C-alpha cells in the first residue's frame, strides 16, 4: 500500500490555494465515512512520484495526516490545463 504524507490546511480559499501551489504543494480534501471532511495539502513531488504507480488509482492509499494514518481511495484528480501539474485531489475514506 502506498503512503503519502499530508498536513491539515489552516487557510482556505483561492489565495491560499495559489500560495500553496507556488510553494510546490496543492490542496486536497478527504471525505466520506462517519467523519467530517478534512481540508489538507500535499507535496506535489511526492504525489507525482506515487501517481505513476498503478496502485495509486487501483488500490487504497495510506494517507498520513499530521501523524494519523487514514486509509483512502483516490476519487478525483484535477490537473492544470497545460502544465504537468496536479491542482487538486479528492480522497474517499475507506
Swiss-Prot record:
GO terms for cellular component: cytosolic large ribosomal subunit. GO terms for biological process: translation. SUPFAM superfamilies: Ribosomal protein L25-like (SSF50715). Keywords: Ribonucleoprotein, Ribosomal protein, RNA-binding, rRNA-binding. GO terms for molecular function: 5S rRNA binding; structural constituent of ribosome. It comes from the Bacteria. Gene3D superfamilies: Ribosomal Protein L25, Chain P. Part of the 50S ribosomal subunit; part of the 5S rRNA/L5/L18/L25 subcomplex. Contacts the 5S rRNA. Binds to the 5S rRNA independently of L5 and L18. Belongs to the bacterial ribosomal protein bL25 family. This is Large ribosomal subunit protein bL25. It comes from Proteus mirabilis (strain HI4320). The gene is rplY.
